């Protein structure tokens, strides 16, 4: 509920989802917070209360899947107030091509400091864009960063309902625990994850400094005029 230029972050993220063109009735906020739930109700945002026992966002979506009747669930985290709606649409369209696949976003890492940053999950995948592994360590591990492409995770996911139900049956698995990356549970369960290239413009808001970065983007004259950042 932190405000960004006067608008609550969860509301901004919800607005990004609406800009994707997805039907409003199929977009909801899943939360274990009564404060967020009440805020959503006051602002006519469809929402659902989940258990405080959910250890990851994917566990939360899996709980929603048990309570609702959809075949595919797309998870955009609530701390993504300037997420590109074109990327949301891209993930939605890919679910039509791969309706039984788990889908996750990625983009190229263009700065060495981001490659070394342990807060950013790095991604390696096959020629067919199937996830091989993710790590908070720099992978592939090499000193020639400027000459070799590296990639990072973008935190938007698409899940078939059946995959979420299987995911929920297990507790955190070893690599998921050691890396603190929830998508690895699917890899450890020998389920494939299809990676899709997205833009690198989004900023996940984890600190007060991130709020300032987002406000700086929103205040730029050239983006005020566009629907992408309104």
Describe the predicted segments one by one:
Residues 84-173:
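Conserved core of the sugar-phosphate nucleotidyltransferase
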Residues 1-28:
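N-terminal glycine-rich phosphate-binding loop and ensuing alpha1 helix
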Residues 31-32, 83, 159, 206:
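A conserved hydrophobic position in a structured secondary element of the catalytic/binding core
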Residues 24, 70, 98-100, 191:
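Short, high-confidence coil segments that cap the C-terminus of an alpha-helix
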Residues 28, 34-93:
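Short phosphate-binding loop-to-helix
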Residues 148-230:
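Conserved alpha/beta core of the MobA/IspD/sugar-nucleotide pyrophosphorylase nucleotidyltransferase superfamily
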